[in-house]
Amino acid sequence: MWSWDISYCPSEVRGQHWYLYLIMDIYSRKIVAWEIHEAESGELAKKLIDRALLRERCWQNPLVLHSDNGAPMTSYTLKARLAELGMLMSHSRPRVSNDNPYSESLFKTLKYCPKWPAKGFASLTAVRKWMLLFEQAYNEEHLHSGINFVTPAQWHQGVDAKLLAKREAVYERAKSLNPRRWSGDTRNWEVAGAVSLNPGKLQEIEFNKQAA
């Protein structure tokens, strides 16, 4: 399942901003595609979805795409394209603020990054350059607490189990050498299982059908 959303990227000029379109994989937390635009539209969202599918090579594997109920997310243009692709569409429930938690959490991580410019960006090009660096650092270097401190890229590539097994072996050896330093079990380095948007809460998923 992918989650996507749009967030503001402020300019140095008061009242001006750009829109960050961002798609992530909720299982691995990996950023799979993003773009910066001067407007919100279903057409721009459609193009980003196409690019994400091409980049991840999953044209033949229909996904579920989750979002809130913003205008670009519910536009006919996007719905029609998802119908062509055979993708399912999931939306946040009306008046429920935490139904898109993964995208919201990622935007918080992004905007609380120490290198986020407090006074805004100088230009559209500057925003894009910043996002390129952030994507690289987040996907390839950031040890994500939600996936047991491996990087999103490692989780996405399926190498997390081997890494976590090595960590567990290191901890067990340390415990055997110095048992007095350990009052209980070592840290749990098991691979995390399935994830969900909001455990225990029904989520509406619809299959998009093109209008005749």
Language model regions located:
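Charged DNA-binding/catalytic regions of mobile-element recombinases
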Residues: 1-212
